Amino acid sequence: MSATVLDGKAAAAAVKADLKERVAALRERGVVPGLGTVLVGDDPGSASYVRGKHRDCAEVGIASIQVELPATATQGEIESEIAQLNANPDCTGFIVQLPLPAGIDANRILEQVDPDKDADGLHPTNLGRLVLRVREEITSPLPCTPRGVIDLLLRHDVPLDGAEVVVVGRGVTVGRPIGLLLTRRHPNATVTLCHTGTRDLESHLRRADVIVAAAGVAGLVTKENVKPGAAVLDVGVSRVLDPATGKSKLAGDVALDVAEVAGFVAPNPGGVGPMTRALLLTNVVESAERAAGLR
């Protein structure tokens, strides 16, 4: 068996094409969606990530609002910038790029973001709405990576209603919120959340119809632990030593040989990552649509 690749790049391109049309419709009404980013310090990885966000914005017609602060910025200075973005009608969604410098209370910073402008979909208020609304339509920003995982599966007709889904990793960006989305009346999946305290992880994996690997442990999921035909999505990222070069390189949680037994595989890179970026833009556009009374 050779697994079907869940192509996140192609799916993200389709999402962006749809967003481009929706942004054009908003512009005809005099509404221009805007993404704000708050970057503190000069970390090259963070700066590159933020630049990528704004390139994505340019593709679909979203305005860019960039706030850059030195690594010496105080808690109060960062909070002041957040307050300005909250009040700025040109900004329909924004993110605070993590990590923040040592000494900054990141949780306090993130909690001050207006929930309606929470482009990451991870504000406590928005996660609370996911807990409370099992059947009702969600009218607030959704967590980007979990939403991207589900979108990618549905686009490839992977059945989720009643499916056994095993999520490995309990981080706030993927592991914890994805269960809230998957156990809603739709998609209606059954979710097991595994982590470092899980006994006999392999037995959980072997029963799964869908595996979402988000632990940050290189090669954690191998073909011996995957049920034939299962869908396996690699969302984990860690650094390992490349024996060929002696340098570190990025690695996912899923071993390459999983493709020999799985029915579907979302590789890393190229799988869920592009969808995460595209759905961040979706949150920004949907916020603008709600503000314009279109949702």
Swiss-Prot record:
Pathway stated in the Swiss-Prot or TrEMBL entry: One-carbon metabolism; tetrahydrofolate interconversion
Disulfide bridges in this chain: none
Function: Catalyzes the oxidation of 5,10-methylenetetrahydrofolate to 5,10-methenyltetrahydrofolate and then the hydrolysis of 5,10-methenyltetrahydrofolate to 10-formyltetrahydrofolate.
GO molecular function annotations of the record: methenyltetrahydrofolate cyclohydrolase activity; methylenetetrahydrofolate dehydrogenase (NADP+) activity
Record: residues binding NADP(+): G169, R170, G171, T196, V237
Alphabetically ordered keywords of this record: Amino-acid biosynthesis, Histidine biosynthesis, Hydrolase, Methionine biosynthesis, Multifunctional enzyme, NADP, One-carbon metabolism, Oxidoreductase, Purine biosynthesis
Protein family membership: Belongs to the tetrahydrofolate dehydrogenase/cyclohydrolase family.
NCBIfam families linked to this entry: PRK14193.1 (NF010789)
GO cellular component, one term: cytosol
Recorded superkingdom: Bacteria
Biological processes, Gene Ontology terms: L-histidine biosynthetic process; methionine biosynthetic process; purine nucleotide biosynthetic process; tetrahydrofolate interconversion
Quaternary assembly: Homodimer.
Residues making up the signal peptide according to the UniProt record: none
Reaction catalysis annotation: (6R)-5,10-methylene-5,6,7,8-tetrahydrofolate + NADP(+) = (6R)-5,10-methenyltetrahydrofolate + NADPH; (6R)-5,10-methenyltetrahydrofolate + H2O = (6R)-10-formyltetrahydrofolate + H(+)
Enzyme Commission number, as recorded: 1.5.1.5, 3.5.4.9
InterPro entries linked to this entry: Aminoacid_DH-like_N_sf, NAD(P)-bd_dom_sf, THF_DH/CycHdrlase, THF_DH/CycHdrlase_cat_dom, THF_DH/CycHdrlase_NAD-bd_dom
Gene3D superfamilies referenced in this protein's UniProt entry, alphabetically: Leucine Dehydrogenase, chain A, domain 1, NAD(P)-binding Rossmann-like Domain
Name this protein carries in UniProt: Bifunctional protein FolD
